[in-house]
Amino acid sequence: MASHKTFRIKRFLAKKQKQNRPIPQWIQMKTGNKIMYNSKRRHWRRTKLGL
């Protein structure tokens, strides 16, 4: 990744960074909840973004 990024790329990376987190604990605690973990987690070494 170049150190000089366009704003579009930077915005794209920022969004992916925000998406890449576990689900909040209070969501796990909700009644009738079936979501136990974030299935769309991405590891920087295993799965690349395809830029």
Curated annotation (Swiss-Prot):
Function comment: Male germ cell-specific component of the ribosome, which is required for the formation of sperm and male fertility. Replaces the RPL39 paralog in the ribosome of male germ cells. The ribosome is a large ribonucleoprotein complex responsible for the synthesis of proteins in the cell. The male germ cell-specific ribosome displays a ribosomal polypeptide exit tunnel of distinct size and charge states compared with the classical ribosome. It is responsible for regulating the biosynthesis and folding of a subset of male germ-cell-specific proteins that are essential for the formation of sperm.
Name of the protein described by the UniProt record: Large ribosomal subunit protein eL39-like
Subcellular location: Cytoplasm
Domain of life: Eukaryota
Gene Ontology annotations of biological process type: cytoplasmic translation; spermatogenesis
Recorded family membership: Belongs to the eukaryotic ribosomal protein eL39 family.
Subunit organization: Component of a male germ cell-specific 60S large ribosomal subunit (LSU), which contains RPL10L and RPL39L, instead of RPL10 and RPL39 paralogs. The composition of the rest of the complex is similar to classical ribosomes.
Keywords recorded for this protein, A-Z: Cytoplasm, Ribonucleoprotein, Ribosomal protein
GO molecular function: structural constituent of ribosome
Gene null: resulting phenotype: Defective sperm formation, resulting in substantially reduced male fertility. Male mice show smaller testis sizes, lower testis/body weight ratio, increased ratios of abnormal sperm head and tail and severe subfertility with significantly fewer cumulative live pups born compared with wild-type mice. The sperm count, motility and progressive motility are reduced. Female mice display normal fertility.
Species this chain originates from: Mus musculus
GO cellular component, one term: cytosolic large ribosomal subunit
Pfam families per record: Ribosomal_L39
Major localisation: cytoplasm
Gene3D superfamilies: Ribosomal protein L39e
InterPro entries: Ribosomal_eL39 (IPR000077), Ribosomal_eL39_CS (IPR020083), Ribosomal_eL39_dom_sf (IPR023626)
Cysteine-cysteine disulfides: none
Tissues expressing this chain: Highly expressed in spermatocytes and spermatids. Highly expressed in embryonic stem cells.
Tagged with keyword Ribosomal protein: yes
